[in-house]
Structure formats: structure tokens, C-alpha cells
Design a protein with these regions (language model features):
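Short runs within selected transmembrane alpha-helices of multi-pass transporters and secretion channels
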Residues: 70, 74, 139-157, 165-176, ...
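Small-residue-rich hydrophobic transmembrane alpha-helices
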Residues: 49-109, 146-165, 259, 273-331, ...
Length: 450
């Protein structure tokens, strides 16, 4: 097929690494948008960081919803490529883009209209709440750019061309890095300046994707961006992407509750610690997500082509790679938590509280990487429901655990321990689940249910 890479032949280690590195770098770039905002806004003080941190849960939720079409693209297009069906690959690509636009407009409108009651959930001081509402309304108008770019990224990943999203996202990051200090301090816009800078960068990424697909690439032989939705393709996309989007969205709802609890226990410092710590933790998350996405795309093609031995070897290789990095992140967070947190929020009370969070959370980093790597295996073979079941169940266990630990007198640290314990459980359970079903689900690798 035109414009794609065949992942069913050739050296597995090199293909996985070459595919994972740009995806991982792209994930880091997407993470860097938030970290760049956080680092500059951190110079305004912990209250400003708390304001954008409260919105950060909602932008995370938005990114989670966009996974419906990112994962939907990666798996549906990837399996169509593996099955040598270019017509299906083109149709899936068009359907994913169309669905992404519809969902993003609806979701962005809801956030814009209900920004005030949503932000007031956190019970922050009035001036912090006002800043957060303005920030959210600006960000919400740019959600179509985020959703469509996620769908474009999924299509390129499925085609084995993960370098393209990397370079495009990198361009957006550079623009955001330049605009952040200009808008925040130069124009004196404060937290709103960070929102405007991010909006412009995300719009630029979207426009570059459009130019790349329309004027430079003939990916899949060319396909229309928008199409009349057909039940066959729409149902398959939702079957693949909805469990992933649901588990990540519900995860964000859980974190919204934990954020409120952190705010009650530690006021704006507690909320700031949890949201900023989560952004820093994304170092591990995005690394494992990069390998997981590469593994998913690799397995999708090889599973559809009946290459079971390549599926298993790719799984073993990815576990080894992510295990090394997970161990490194554990050591970094446990022993250098204060120093890492101070890079983003140099206020002493903030980085001391953040250091405690990173130390506790650091114990679970290896297991987080294990969980996300295993998600890539399940997604690649088209079984997105098991990871959703495990993730949703364990994530919701954080709420009663956090309440229990707080009532035991552990304070805000009880919330951190609830997060750590459930993360360990998710990794171990998902690995065990796949080991149990591995023989059965790979016995007829060419079977792809619609």
C-alpha cells in the first residue's frame, strides 16, 4: 500500500525501536506543553499553578476522550493494512477524523458553557477559581484541533510512519515555548497568556497536519477527511476506541475527586501538589505510552497477518525496555523528588510537599509501565475491554482507599498511598490476565472480529 511501512517482516527490535522512539518523543512533546505552561506559571506562584492545575484534569479528560479516535485509528487502520485492505484503511481513516470533529465540538461546547460550576467543584479561593474559569474557556475553544490532531497521529502510527507526528508536534512545542513567556510576562496576561500560547500552538499543529496530508503525502493512496458515517466502520471504531477512552475518562473523574480531597486536606498546596506531580509523573507515563502505542501498531499488523511468533517476541522486547526505564524513574522520584519538583515550582512549601508525593508515587512507576505496556498488547489484538475493566476497577478503588487513609489520620499523604497501591495492582493483574488467555487468544491469530 502507498505511504505505509510493512511491520510484518524485518528485524523486530529495530522496527519496534524505530517506531517507538518518534511516538515516545511525540508523547513527551505533548506532555511538554503542560510542563512548559507549568514551569512558566510556577514563577507566578503556587496559586497560579493551582488554577491551571484544576483545569489540567479537564484537559486530561479531553485528551482521554480523544483516545477514542487515536486508538481507533491505530488499530482499525493498522489491522486493515495488515490484512492488505487499502479501501477499508481509507474508510477507517475518514471515519475516525469525522467522529473526532463531532465529539470535540460537543465536548468543547459543554466545557465552555459549564466552566464555572465545574471549577467550583474544587472549592478553591475565589480569585484562583476566577483565573481557572477564564483559562478553561480559552482552552475549550481549541479542543477540535487536539482531537483532529490525535486522529491524524493515530493514522500515521498505524501506517508505521510515526516520525511525521513527531516532527509536527515538535514544531508546535517550539512555538509554545516561544509564546509562553511572551504572553504570560511580556503581554502581562498571566495564566490566560499560557492558555493563548497553547491554543495557537495546537492550531498550528493541526494546520501542519492538514498541509502534510493534503499537499505532501499520499498516505493510503489518499482519503477524504470527512465522510458520511457508515454503521460498519463507526461501530468497529467505537468497539476499539470506546473502552480505551472510557477508562481514561473515568480515570480523570477519579482524579477530579482526589483533587477535591487534596484541596480539602491541603488547600491550594494540596491541589497543586497532586496536579503538578501528575504532570511530572507523565515522564514515566508518556515513555511507556510511546512503547505501548508502537507495540499496538506492530501487533495489529502482525496479528492480522498471522505472525504469532513476531507478536510474542515484540511483547518480550517491549517489557524489557520499559522495565529498565521504569526502574530509573523509581530511583529518580524516590531519591530526588524535591529537586525534580523544584524545577517547576521553586516555592519552598510547594516543592517540599511535591517531594513527598513523588517519593510515594515513585514506588509504583515500574508497575505503571507494566500496565501500559500490557495495554498495547491487548489493543493490538483488538481486545480493548480487559484493560478497561482492570483500570476502571482499580482506579475507582482509589476513592474508598483515599477516604479510609485520610480518616486514619494520614492526611493528604493517604491520597498519595491510595494512588500508589492501586497502580501496583493494575500492572500485576493485567499481566496475569494476558498470561492466562495468551494461548487461547493467539491460537487463531488471523481472526479479527468486526
Amino acid at each position: 500500500m502507498q505511504g505505509i511501512k510493512n511491520l510484518t517482516q524485518g528485524p523486530i527490535n529495530r522496527q519496534l525501536f524505530n517506531l517507538a522512539m518518534p511516538i515516545m518523543a511525540t508523547s513527551f512533546i505533548q506532555m511538554a506543553y503542560s510542563l512548559t505552561d507549568m514551569a512558566w506559571v510556577g514563577r507566578l506562584g503556587s496559586e497560579a499553578v493551582a488554577a491551571i492545575g484544576s483545569v489540567g484534569i479537564l484537559t486530561w479528560m479531553s485528551g482521554s476522550i480523544s483516545l477514542l479516535n487515536k486508538v481507533g485509528s491505530e488499530v482499525s487502520v493498522g489491522q486493515s493494512i495488515g490484512a492488505q485492505s487499502q479501501e477499508d484503511a481509507r474508510s477507517f481513516a475518514s471515519h475516525n477524523i469525522t467522529i473526532a470533529l463531532i465529539i470535540s465540538i460537543c465536548w468543547g461546547t459543554l466545557l465552555f458553557i459549564f466552566a464555572e460550576p465545574i471549577i467550583r467543584i474544587y472549592e478553591l479561593e475565589d480569585h484562583i477559581t476566577a483565573n481557572a474559569i477564564q483559562y478553561l474557556r480559552i482552552i475549550s475553544t481549541g479542543l477540535p484541533f487536539i482531537f483532529l490532531s490525535a486522529a491524524f497521529t493515530g493514522i500515521y502510527n498505524a501506517a508505521g510512519r510515526s516520525k511525521v507526528p513527531f516532527f509536527i508536534s515538535g514544531t508546535g512545542l517550539i512555538l509554545n515555548i516561544i509564546l509562553d513567556p511572551l504572553f504570560i510576562f511580556g503581554f502581562g496576561l498571566g495564566t490566560n497568556g499560557a492558555a493563548y500560547a497553547t491554543w495557537i500552538a495546537e492550531a498550528s499543529v493541526f494546520l501542519i497536519f492538514v498541509y502534510q496530508l493534503r499537499c505532501r503525502d499520499a498516505l493510503l493512496g489518499g482519503f477524504p477527511f470527512f465522510t458520511r458515517l457508515k454503521k460498519k466502520y463507526t461501530r468497529r471504531i467505537f468497539k476499539l476506541g470506546l473502552p480505551v477512552a472510557t477508562l481514561n475518562t473515568l480515570f480523570a473523574f477519579v482524579n477530579m475527586f482526589l483533587c477535591r480531597t487534596a484541596s480539602e486536606q491541603g488547600e491550594h498546596i494540596g491541589l497543586m501538589t497532586f496536579t503538578t506531580g501528575g504532570q511530572i509523573e507523565a515522564i514515566t507515563w508518556n515513555t511507556s505510552q510511546g512503547f505501548s502505542t508502537a507495540l499496538s501498531a506492530f501487533i495489529a499488523q502482525n496479528y492480522a497477518a498471522g505472525r504469532v511468533e513476531r507478536v510474542l517476541r515484540a511483547w518480550y522486547t517491549t517489557l524489557w525496555m520499559t522495565g529498565i526505564f521504569g526502574t530509573f524513574c523509581t530511583l529518580l522520584f524516590v531519591f530526588f523528588g524535591n529537586e525534580v519538583f523544584a524545577i517547576f515550582v521553586p516555592e519552598q512549601a510547594a516543592y517540599e510537599a511535591g517531594g513527598v508525593f513523588l517519593r510515594i508515587d515513585g514506588y509504583s512507576q515500574l508497575f505503571m509501565m507494566l500496565e501500559i505496556t500490557m495495554q498495547g498488547v491487548f489493543y493490538g489484538i483488538g481486545r480493548t475491554i480487559p484493560p478497561a475493566i482492570i483500570s476502571i476497577s482499580c482506579n475507582y478503588m482509589r476513592i474508598p482507599l483515599a477516604i479510609l487513609f485520610v480518616r486514619m489520620g494520614m492526611g493528604v499523604e493517604g491520597i498519595w498511598w491510595a494512588v500508589c497501591i492501586t497502580t501496583v495492582a493494575k500492572g500485576l493483574i493485567l499481566l496475569s490476565w494476558f498470561i492466562i488467555i495468551k494461548k487461547k487468544c493467539l491460537s487463531i491469530p488471523s481472526t479479527i472480529k468486526g
